[in-house]
């Protein structure tokens, strides 16, 4: 029996008023996940569109399915009009109906039947104008104001698709559970969007859509695909993300025109050797499955530019990966990889290589050949050192992330390895020294993260890091901050928490662009008066030190929004704290010697949070303290000798 036989007449193949056959090819759109990320399914336009030869293409049919990438028009707005752009009017807008009778941009009002006018409002059908290709006459049609709720509505949609020769059909986000067999009659379809429904299986008749090029089935409950899908020999994009597939359906391996295949977030445990048949693939996403082995078949996919196998259980990669010489993005992060094959060096077009969070103890020296890479990230492995001079060979690198490994020293290769780098992250290693002159060629270096290492001192040439914007030296064993810190006048973020600093140099006042200064958990007793010169400072964190008083110059920090001096030895707060007009959060809790607050604190009108826990404030009644910042400030104001405040 021929599943694809139907009563459709040949007239459905042409919708041009001149009798000219309509052009092949669907409306552009329908992109999905890109580079392993979550993408959408393209714009869903409405209405017909003009072709290059002046004839009219078949319109797109889009049902309202809520907001999202398809973006159908909801309510009583127009579905299309004569002045629609090429990809259809109203697809991306997602606008809702206003409740008024709309008028199309071509001047035609929506038509109402006289009988409808006499019907009660609650039973009167909503009317929308659909521009039919063979005529400029508006055609009334019924449109629900809510997403499709019942599967019988799909039957009507498919009938209309058949009758009007629709090429692009969007039934996404419509709570559909079953696709009826009448889908076989929609022979003009080139794009079909069924994502975000409740579909458990596809009918065999789906194979009748032999013109289909883009099929989006993501976010359903599919466990298999019908064998008849192999008849869709022109299919180029297949999106099966977020389903319940335990294996790659065998029929997929026979879709040899596929260029893009998304299988992310399923339950796939293995990849068959038949994968080698998909030689036209340029993008393959197997992200977030349960795959333990990637066979040699991957090497046959020589046209691949993007391969995402992240978040699986891979322990090894086949040497054949080196045959995929057109790869520009290879994502291997969050696996259990123990090694990387030497053949990786054949991938000379590689720009991005994700190796984060694996079980690597080393990387191959052949990576030197991948000179197009702009980012090198091996965070969360067990690497102790990189191949000698490898980073220097990768002269295009701008970002280097070596955090959460076992480095005891900086990578070998000298200053040349950081020439074009603007961000270096070596957090959570065992490095005890930053080599003198290591950044002498790094003129563009703006971010350095050395948090959670074993540094006891900073290099004498720290003053040459003049372009540094963000410097994180937290959780080390630093005992002194060099005076030359004053030369880092582009610095905006300085984090020195959890060290052994006893004082801050007066030259700190030269860092006029500083926005965040974190000195938490040190041994600081006194802050320099020059702290008041940091007029751009927004966050000052001083908690868990041994500070006995704040300098009066703190009143000059007009942009300060967050001040934490909890767990210190404060005896009082300076009156100048009342000048902090931008202050929103003030932590002064656990200062056992702080017995009173200055009345001037009431001038901090923007204060939203005040923590005074475990401070013996004998002058303020407990019930006032328990009432929160506003009540405390009100009490201070009422009892102030300056009633005019």
From Swiss-Prot:
LRR repeats lie at residues 165-186, 188-209, 211-232, 234-255, 257-278, 280-301, 303-324, 326-347, 349-371, 372-393, 396-417, 420-441, 444-465, 467-488, 490-511, 513-534, 536-557, 559-580, 582-604, 606-627. Residues 1-67, 83-151 are annotated as: Disordered. Residues 26-49, 88-97 have a biased composition (Gly residues). Residues 1-19, 98-107 have a biased composition (Low complexity). It comes from the Eukaryota. Gene3D superfamilies: Ribonuclease Inhibitor. It comes from Drosophila yakuba (Fruit fly). This is Leucine-rich repeat protein soc-2 homolog. Belongs to the SHOC2 family. Keywords: Leucine-rich repeat, Repeat. InterPro entries: Leu-rich_rpt, Leu-rich_rpt_typical-subtyp, LRR-SigEffector_domain, LRR_dom_sf, LRR_R13L4/SHOC2-like. SUPFAM superfamilies: L domain-like. Acts as a Ras effector and participates in MAPK pathway activation. Probably acts as a regulatory subunit of protein phosphatase that specifically dephosphorylates Raf kinase and stimulate Raf activity at specialized signaling complexes upon Ras activation.
